[in-house]
Swiss-Prot record:
This is Chaperone protein DnaK. Residues 578-605 are annotated as: Disordered. Belongs to the heat shock protein 70 family. Keywords: ATP-binding, Chaperone, Nucleotide-binding, Phosphoprotein, Stress response. It comes from the Bacteria. One of its GO terms (molecular function) is ATP-dependent protein folding chaperone. It comes from Priestia megaterium (Bacillus megaterium). Residues 591-605 have a biased composition (Acidic residues).
């Protein structure tokens, strides 16, 4: 069975891992780094992903970052005049991860386990699955990030019974989950979170502070300058990371903008204390879900055995202090917060292929599910934190006399009124025989699969007529749209491959021109003039083809020149060999010496 890779598709960074010899292992990217920025850029029709895209973000307006924040919405991003859905952008990142995983493994990769924030709703999960499909991946399982982290942490400790709190603060999302580990069973007791809170927001408070300081000093508002803002974003991210290790950092951005008197420079010193003050509100926002999860699990903080920190933003000292204060214990430092989620996804891949035995994962649904009933009330069928997969049915009736159809409005959320919750979908059950209100019996069944994706069925118990829907949110993609995007993604992958081959061909041709010139210099006076002229003509023809950028011609002229140069090089070696042999022969004749020898008997020594 082919390997199933584990992918942590993050807001700011992504990571891919695989199970090798029973151990999960992170696959490094082509630059040698273990995580890849979730950044896509377009430049003259060419796509760039990861490190390369992030490096030129300052100067390229067609750079897309943090697209995960828009998953499951109808938000579109525009680049070079074309609009893309968040699914397509995520698919480009997934394709990049898939590509270098294939190079590392030396075999095609078609299956993956992809992680999502525990608090992702159905639309966001469906969008993630669609992104995988567009990238040419069969998404075997969608699992929650904190659950994956617990899996990576607890795999070696299956004989211990533990209650673990996973605090996951990523680039754009925040989750907290409480799990019980024991006998190879990883059971999620409760989960809570905020999908609009992460490291990006910590960067933003620094950016806002720098903009305010600069305006106070120079009277110029940098927030109106797109290029200055990108430089500020990079500087803010770096300052945030620096302040995890030092108590003060200097932010220096020369020539940030120009005033009436000439260029202006930004020089600001930021202390850790000031950063703590700026981000205090954000840190406090993460505490409410921690309290909520403990309450839902029916636990007090003292009953926790371990607190595990996941996500790069958990390196912020104020975050660590707050979680320590809230739970009364030091967070466990034995896992790499950037990699642990991908490692857990790879382990889940191993569970699915049968390479990892005796591990059972019991996840939960993060939000309650139900339908709208009379008066706009949200009636829950499945409560949040219910272990999945699960199904639940309830019988409803009509609200008016002689009603022949009912609208089933499916929602997800915790608020009592339908209008305040997230619509997952709507469908209609028709042809109900006319009857007084309250008489028809309509059974509504909810079914949540192992990926947390919802199916809903409505059945008229009188006629046995049934209507079913797999929830595809209003922002979801149709099968035709997905197929079109899959095709486009494949074409782009081919185009990227072709572009790479073209660049390599040009480089080889340039290299050949250089080596030819060097070889001809070495051959001066050693071969016939006609042969040198022939080589020079072929070299000039290749140079002209490179100038014209005609790939077919470059290939033909390169092969032609290579043949001529090889023949000349063979001649050069032959001449060198003949000269060497002649030299050795002469040396042998000169060195002949008559000698006498005496045999020594060892016994006499």
């Amino acid at each position: 069975m082919s390997k199933i890779i584990g992918i942590d598709l993050g807001t700011t960074n992504s990571c891919v891992a695989v199970l090798e010899g029973g151990e999960p292992k992170v696959i490094p990217n082509p630059e040698g780094n273990r995580t890849t920025p979730s950044v896509v850029a377009f430049k003259n029709g060419e796509r760039q992903v990861g490190e390369v895209a992030k490096r030129q973000a300052i100067t390229n307006p067609n750079t897309i970052i943090s697209v995960k924040r828009h998953m499951g919405t109808d938000h579109k991003v525009e680049a070079e005049g074309k609009q893309y859905t968040p699914q397509e952008m995520s698919a480009i990142i997934l394709q990049h991860l898939k590509g270098y995983a294939e190079e590392y493994l030396g075999e095609p990769v078609t299956k993956a386990v992809i992680t999502v924030p525990a608090y992702f709703n159905d639309a966001e999960r469906q969008a993630t699955k669609d992104a995988g499909k567009i990238a040419g991946l069969e998404v075997e399982r969608i699992i929650n990030e904190p659950t994956a982290a617990a899996l990576a942490y607890g795999l070696e400790k299956t004989d211990e019974d533990q209650t673990v709190l996973v605090y996951d603060l990523g680039g754009g999302t925040f989750d907290v989950s409480i799990l019980e580990l024991g006998d190879g069973v990883f059971e999620v007791r409760a989960t809570a979170g905020d999908n609009r809170l992460g490291g990006d927001d910590f960067d933003q408070v620094i950016i806002d502070y720098l903009v305010a300081e600069f305006k106070k000093e120079n009277g110029v508002d940098l927030s109106k300058d797109k290029m200055a803002l990108q430089r500020l974003k990079d500087a803010a991210e770096k300052a945030k990371k620096d302040l995890s290790g030092v108590t003060s950092t200097q932010i220096s951005l020369p020539f940030i903008t120009a005033g009436e008197a000439g260029p202006l420079h930004l020089e600001v010193s930021l202390s850790r204390a000031k950063f703590d003050e700026l981000s205090a509100g954000l840190v406090e926002r993460t505490m409410a879900p921690v309290r909520q999860a403990l309450k839902d699990a029916g636990l007090s903080a003292s009953e926790l055995d371990k607190v595990i920190l996941v996500g790069g933003s958990t390196r912020i000292p104020a975050v660590q202090d707050a979680i320590k204060k809230e739970t009364g214990q030091d967070p466990h430092k034995g896992v790499n917060p950037d990699e642990v989620v991908a490692l857990g996804a790879a382990i889940q891949g191993g569970v699915l292929t049968g390479d990892v035995k005796d591990v059972v994962l019991l996840d939960v649904t993060p939000l309650s599910l139900g339908i709208e009933t009379m008066g706009g009330v949200f009636t829950k069928l499945i409560e949040r934190n219910t272990t999945i997969p699960t199904s639940k049915s309830q019988v409803f009736s009509t609200a008016a006399d002689s009603q022949t159809a009912v609208d089933i409005h499916v929602l997800q959320g915790e608020r009592p009124m339908s209008a305040d919750n997230k619509t997952l979908g709507r469908f209609q059950l028709t042809d109900i025989p006319p009857a007084p209100r309250g008489v028809p019996q309509i059974e509504v069944s909810f079914d949540i699969d192992k990926n947390g994706i919802v199916n809903v069925r409505a059945k008229d118990l009188g006629t046995n007529k049934e209507q079913a829907i797999t929830i595809k949110s209003s922002t979801g993609l149709s099968d035709d749209e997905i197929d079109r995007m899959v095709k486009e993604a494949e074409e782009n992958a081919d185009a990227d491959k072709q572009r790479k081959e073209e660049v390599e061909l040009r480089n080889e041709a340039d290299q050949l021109v250089f080596t030819t010139e060097k070889t001809l210099k070495d051959l001066e006076g050693k071969v016939e003039e006609a042969e040198v002229t022939k080589a020079n003509e072929a070299k000039d023809a290749l140079k002209a083809a490179i100038e014209k950028n005609d790939l077919e011609e470059i290939k033909a002229k390169k092969d032609e020149l290579q043949e001529i140069v090889q023949a000349l090089t063979v001649k050069l070696y032959e001449q060198a060999q003949q000269a060497q042999q002649a030299g050795e022969q002469g040396a042998q004749n000169d060195d002949v010496v008559d000698a006498e020898f005496e045999e020594v008997n060892d016994d006499k020594k």
